[in-house]
Regions:
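Glycine-enriched, solvent-exposed interface loops adjoining structured elements
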Residues: 1-234
């Protein structure tokens, strides 16, 4: 489902009685407001369920222990300075860019096929993770490559691109619609809006509970084809 289809679904259903909709469409001037609510609802769902897992490759250098996982350190942003190798350690390409979308790190392996302990200060192979997008190696004596697998965030949807795809499993769209409707109604001060916001929040909670109890949830994994690539070797 793309963003326009989501807006139309809401306008024909859970927010159809509001002044921001007309003839089954969200009025143009209110589209940013509804898109903001959709983004918040998606963020909520991604925090509850492991919707997507991805991986990023990080090249370690002797003498460096801290590695912020941000795109400013990616290979595709290197400008050819002398210190490129030291400052640009995230291995990506323009075709497969790192998108600054780390929600939480799941596991870490190195190019010797070792699973690295996380947040274990007693292990020389341990990787400390004080922040979701920062890793600290315990020992920086050799040149290694890490594959960091992580739960990914959904990219922020823009009201300027209504063709953007909403990346959710089909069975989560009901929760998305209910939580979005809850946010929009709760932003209004009428008695009817307050009652509707409570109704849609309860509806959202019921859907989430049912999914957690009855639906096996496997994340959309985008890590299986990742290979360790380092300047000419795999």
């Amino acid at each position: 489902m793309n963003l326009q289809e989501c807006l139309d679904k809401l306008a024909r259903g859970k927010i159809s009685n509001l002044a921001l909709c007309e003839n089954g469409k969200v009025k143009e001037k209110f589209i940013p407001k509804v898109v903001d609510a959709i983004n918040e609802a998606i963020t909520r769902l991604y925090s509850v369920f492991p919707v997507k897992e991805k991986a990023v490759l990080v090249e370690l250098y002797e003498g460096r222990t801290e590695y912020p996982l941000t795109s400013e350190h990616s290979w595709r942003n290197a400008q050819g300075e002398i210190d490129d190798e030291y400052n640009y350690y995230i291995i990506d390409t323009p075709e497969d860019p790192f998108m600054d979308d780390i929600q939480s790190i799941v596991e870490i392996h190195d190019d010797l096929n070792r699973r690295r302990p996380m947040n274990d200060p007693d292990s020389p192979l341990g990787i400390m993770i004080p922040e979701p997008n920062l890793i600290i190696v315990q020992v920086a004596l050799d040149h290694r490559v890490l594959q960091v697998s992580y739960r990914a965030k959904h990219l922020i949807l823009s009201p300027d691109d209504l063709t953007s795809t909403i990346q959710l499993p089909e069975h989560l769209f009901g929760a998305l619609f209910s939580y979005t409707a809850y946010l929009i109604h709760s932003d209004m001060n009428t008695q009817e809006a307050v009652a509707n916001s409570q109704k849609y929040y309860a509806e959202y909670q019921n859907i989430i509970t049912e999914i957690q109890l009855n639906t096996p949830f496997a994340p959309d994994k985008l890590v299986s084809d990742k290979k360790f690539i380092k300047r000419g070797w795999v």
